[in-house]
């Protein structure tokens, strides 16, 4: 959330607040990595890919569907759309992790990320995001 807060502060021309929010976001990442290491939660790449597949699969099979039902029942269209887009993106993420697990050392293709919904696409940028319908200009290349 701190990165979203930083973006808003940038929009409001409040650079000090934006910088502090970005620093706090990075600090939280440092904390998460430290906690994960302390719990022995970082295995070898194959184990980490299996963990990632399990996590993404849980999200699109068990986590998001009931949340989407609740949002729909409560008439929260924006919340429903957000969760539905994330749910669809998680399916793609799980498939990508499966592909990486099959050959983790291969030369990676170009990978692009839709900044609207989180869809990941390999090789080239689609004209339109298959999940959210955004135009190609919203994609960024990942290193």
Regions found by a protein language model. Name each.
Residues 1-143:
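Non-heme di-metal
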């Amino acid at each position: 959330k701190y990165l979203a807060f930083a973006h808003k502060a940038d929009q409001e021309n409040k650079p000090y607040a934006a910088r502090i929010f970005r620093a706090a976001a990075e600090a939280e990442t440092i904390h998460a990595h430290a906690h994960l290491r302390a719990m022995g939660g970082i295995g070898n790449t194959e184990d980490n890919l299996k963990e990632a597949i399990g996590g993404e699969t849980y999200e699109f099979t068990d986590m998001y569907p009931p949340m989407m039902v609740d949002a729909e029942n409560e008439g929260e269209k924006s919340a429903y759309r957000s969760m539905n887009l994330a749910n669809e993106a998680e399916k793609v993420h799980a498939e990508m992790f499966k592909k990486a697990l099959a050959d983790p050392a291969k030369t990676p293709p170009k990978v692009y990320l839709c900044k609207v919904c989180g869809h990941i696409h390999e090789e080239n940028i689609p004209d339109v995001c298959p999940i959210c319908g955004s135009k190609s200009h919203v994609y960024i290349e990942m290193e």
